[in-house]
């Protein structure tokens, strides 16, 4: 629902003694996010990481892991787009699983990682990272993309609050929508696709196309198509992850608060 961030943050952080926050630097100064963060109980937040870069590389996530490791956090919260969420995911995996990114790629490892719960609040509509057990980062030298997968990268909950999209530039929203379309296409044509995943990918196409067309034709973000694109981005993200990871036992709990 609109304005779900503040109440949701209070709920997911209650009962925790150390909350690590990963927040998009463009969001941390907005009144909406600032007010929500201030609502968290005093003394609960262990640290706030805002050194988020678009399309994070190995050095970026190693820095994030170095931030997280000494905090003794029992809860991790990410507020932002796909880059923020992927940075938080990799920080969690490296801080609690050890090693460097290439230790976890390209083989999809299944060794247990005892890590805190991860709650994510996507601020763009299309990356699908909020519902995937993968994080996409770049090689420092070659810039090659690495899709690192592990069951602990699947968020515990993804909370969809359309109010977070208000600060997102329309161009970014449109590009995120195109990203979501590409996820649906990948899901439909992958060799591991099933009848169910293909049908769901087509549903994602049907959801996102009219919303994307409307967003692209306007000079501002409209609530209705933004909601549809947020929903479709999450939907196609799940299908893309299913195509990559048939047989994974864990899946995130999704709270679809759209309306």
Model segments located where?
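Short Gly/Thr/Asp-enriched flexible loops that form oxyanion-binding sites at enzyme active sites
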Residues: 36, 65, 84-97, 131-132
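A glycine/threonine-rich phosphate-anchoring loop and its flanking beta-alpha core
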Residues: 96-195, 199
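ATP/NTP phosphate-donor binding region
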Residues: 1-75
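Glycine/serine-rich anion-binding loops at beta->alpha junctions
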Residues: 73-89, 123-129, 244
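Electropositive phosphate-/nucleotide-binding environments in soluble metabolic enzymes
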Residues: 2-3, 30, 34, 58, ...
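Active-site segments that bind and position negatively charged phosphate/pyrophosphate groups
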Residues: 187-259
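N-terminal loops that bind phosphate or other acidic moieties
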Residues: 70, 91, 108
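Buried hydrophobic positions in well-ordered alpha/beta secondary-structure cores of metabolic enzymes
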Residues: 21, 57, 82, 122, ...
């Amino acid at each position: 629902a609109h304005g779900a961030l503040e109440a949701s943050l209070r709920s997911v952080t209650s009962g925790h003694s150390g909350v690590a926050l990963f927040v998009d630097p463009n969001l941390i100064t907005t009144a909406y996010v600032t007010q929500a963060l201030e609502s968290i109980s005093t003394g609960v937040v262990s640290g706030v990481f805002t050194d988020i870069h678009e399309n994070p590389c190995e050095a970026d996530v190693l820095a994030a892991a170095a931030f997280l490791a000494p905090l003794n956090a029992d809860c991790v919260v990410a507020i932002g787009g796909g880059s923020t969420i992927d940075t938080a995911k990799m920080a969690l995996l490296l801080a609690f699983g050890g090693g460097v990114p290439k230790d976890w790629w390209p083989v999809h490892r299944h060794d247990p990682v005892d890590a805190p719960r991860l709650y994510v609040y996507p601020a763009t509509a299309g990356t699908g990272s909020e519902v995937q057990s993968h994080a996409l980062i770049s090689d420092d030298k070659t810039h090659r993309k690495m899709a690192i997968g592990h069951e602990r990268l699947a968020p515990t909950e993804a909370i969809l609050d359309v109010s977070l999209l208000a600060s997102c530039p329309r161009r970014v929203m449109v590009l995120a929508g195109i990203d979501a379309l590409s996820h649906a296409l990948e899901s439909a044509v992958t060799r591991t696709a099933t009848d169910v995943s293909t049908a769901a990918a087509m549903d994602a196409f049907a959801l996102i196309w009219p919303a994307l067309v409307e967003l692209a034709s306007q000079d501002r973000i409209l609530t209705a198509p933004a909601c549809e694109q947020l929903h479709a981005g999450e939907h196609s993200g799940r299908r893309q992850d299913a195509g990559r990871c048939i047989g994974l036992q864990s899946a995130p709990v999704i709270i679809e608060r759209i309306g």
